[in-house]
Amino acid sequence: GHQLVNAALGGHNMLNFPRKHAVEHSEGIQHEIVAEEGSILNRLYGPKLLVNSFHRDCADAVGPDVKVTARSLDGIIEAIEHKTLPVFSVQFHPERMRGDAPNPAFGPDGTELFKYFVDLC
């Protein structure tokens, strides 16, 4: 989803990015990301948060009306927001960050991001 939104907004994606960043699908893989001040993620969760990793592809350039709002510590784009439209996307899977089976209990509750999305609609 994240890569599709990025491409639709004029961005470019890297498929099968370098192995040092790629993570096999498995339970409990996590990493820290840094959310930009004023971003949706920063307002909901603060400047740093733990998220899951279930990806081999990533956004590597965003369109002209899009801003990068979070990155992993190794520089992977983890969140984007359109500058004027109510459109945002994240690399991770917030639906798997609820602390209920089979979702591992770490980091913030991803439900808050869904609530934000529903309120935005």
Locate predicted features:
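A generic secondary-structure signal for well-formed alpha-helical elements
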Residues: 9-12, 121
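Catalytic nucleophile loop
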Residues: 1-10, 93
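Short polar/charged helix/loop
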Residues: 5-7, 14-15, 31
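Amide-donor transfer/coupling interface in amidating biosynthetic enzymes
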Residues: 17-121
